[in-house]
Amino acid sequence: MMNMQNMMKQAQKLQKQMEQKQADLAAMQFTGKSAQDLVTATFTGDKKLVGIDFKEAVVDPEDVETLQDMTTQAINDALTQIDETTKKTLGAFAGKLPF
């Protein structure tokens, strides 16, 4: 069985690795798309909105509801990508804890 000092060293090492992975993830960008890519929403890995792009075809003053729906779809798509990448990137640390 590991002694306490070794466990602490391993925990500190894992913490540094996890912090680096979190920083790497925050630096990444994720772009979510609506149907037909008419609306795109880009976020950083720490879920900060970088931009939203609307194609001309979706901008219709008579149909704001479609624009709203597609914007929501693009945002949710990007956030899902972030969550999946976060789970893949940081989930590996759960099995490495020394206790």
UniProtKB/Swiss-Prot annotation:
Source species, domain of life: Bacteria
Record keywords: Cytoplasm, DNA-binding
InterPro entries in the record: YbaB-like_sf, YbaB/EbfC
Gene Ontology CC terms: bacterial nucleoid; cytosol
GO molecular function annotation: DNA binding
Role of this protein: Binds to DNA and alters its conformation. May be involved in regulation of gene expression, nucleoid organization and DNA protection.
NCBIfam families according to UniProt: DNA_YbaB_EbfC (TIGR00103)
Protein name (Swiss-Prot/TrEMBL): Nucleoid-associated protein SPy_1862/M5005_Spy1580
Biological source species: Streptococcus pyogenes serotype M1
